[in-house]
């Protein structure tokens, strides 16, 4: 299938109706279409242009996810539900100011309050993106698989980085989160293998499960003194990590949080009371060669604590 023109008799396009029709290069939607279902055109990577007729009132989640070839998105004037204001090359829900679908040439207007889940999912051609300060939330999988994205700065209003929001963005090299972020969701930056520098603000209280799993480019990691919990597998398979500093604020570390960080040679824990460890937190770490440095008066406590006591070389430092 390379071309698709829908007749005026078609009013709705069902779930996954044309999903993964990667050979589709031209699409003409008639002015009779009122709804486009979930994943209707997902993975139609050959599409370069999309014009949404003014008749469309409903678009399902991930309707255009993975349309990596899209260069231009236009919503016809007169559409009561959606627009592509300011030539933004995106589809925006007028009522909520939510951007629900974008492409590699999208420019996000200052009026957008939310980037919806899956809005840019699989948009591998996206290389630059400026998020305006109007954006307060970013949905799940919003930028998953945007492998061409190299830099990311989140606006100061974003409080939560939701699950898988930037997973598999392997081109990202540096990540700085604003002081507004309090929680990093599960798999949020999973397999962002290009990240070499990670700066987390003092506002972050929890790091979700597998949040930075497979970030193999990370070599050093210092967590801020606000983090209380580290989720299961949060930094698992960060095989390039050599030094780790855990703050005094950490109370619990989930199962396998640092599993298979095989190059770890130095861990500094600033907590006087050893954080509670889940199952095999440091599995795959050479506990004979990796040095564990803890507060001077806490060496005995660490030698007794579960998982910490598996390290052969525990020594104290003076504050």
Locations of regions flagged by a protein language model:
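Structural signature of tandem-repeat unit edges
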Residues: 1-12, 22-35, 45-58, 68-90, ...
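Consensus positions within tandem repeat domains that build extended binding/scaffold surfaces
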Residues: 14-17, 37-42, 60-63, 116-121, ...
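Short, aromatic/basic amphipathic alpha-helical patches
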Residues: 280-283, 300-311
């Amino acid at each position: 299938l390379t071309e698709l023109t829908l007749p005026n008799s078609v009013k709705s396009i069902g779930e996954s109706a044309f999903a993964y029709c990667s050979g589709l290069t031209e699409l003409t939607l008639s002015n009779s279409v009122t709804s486009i279902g979930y994943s209707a055109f997902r993975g139609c990577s050959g599409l370069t242009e999309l014009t949404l007729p003014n008749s469309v009132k409903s678009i399902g989640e991930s309707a255009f996810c993975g349309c990596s070839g899209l260069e231009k998105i236009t919503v016809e004037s007169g559409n009561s539900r959606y627009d592509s204001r300011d030539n933004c090359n995106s589809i925006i829900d007028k009522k909520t100011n939510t951007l629900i679908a974008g492409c590699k040439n999208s420019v996000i207007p200052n009026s957008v309050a939310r980037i919806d889940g899956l809005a840019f999912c699989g948009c591998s051609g996206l290389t630059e993106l400026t998020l305006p300060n109007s954006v307060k939330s970013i949905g799940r999988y919003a930028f998953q698989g945007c492998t061409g994205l190299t830099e990311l700065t989140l606006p100061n209003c974003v409080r939560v980085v939701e699950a898988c929001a930037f997973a598999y963005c392997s081109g990202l090299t540096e990540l700085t989160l604003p002081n507004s972020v309090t929680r990093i969701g599960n798999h949020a930056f999973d397999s962002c293998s290009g990240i070499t520098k990670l700066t987390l603000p003092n506002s972050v209280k929890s790091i979700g499960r597998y949040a930075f799993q497979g970030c193999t480019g990370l070599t050093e990691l210092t967590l801020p003194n606000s983090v209380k919990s580290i989720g299961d597998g949060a930094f698992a398979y960060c095989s390039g990590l050599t030094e780790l500093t855990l703050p005094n604020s950490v109370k619990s570390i989930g199962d396998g949080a640092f599993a298979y960080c095989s190059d770890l040679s130095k861990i500094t824990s600033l907590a006087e009371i050893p954080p509670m460890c889940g199952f095999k937190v440091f599995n795959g770490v050479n506990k004979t060669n990796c040095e564990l440095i803890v507060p001077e008066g806490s060496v005995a406590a660490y030698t007794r604590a579960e998982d910490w006591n598996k390290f052969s070389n525990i020594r104290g430092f003076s504050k």
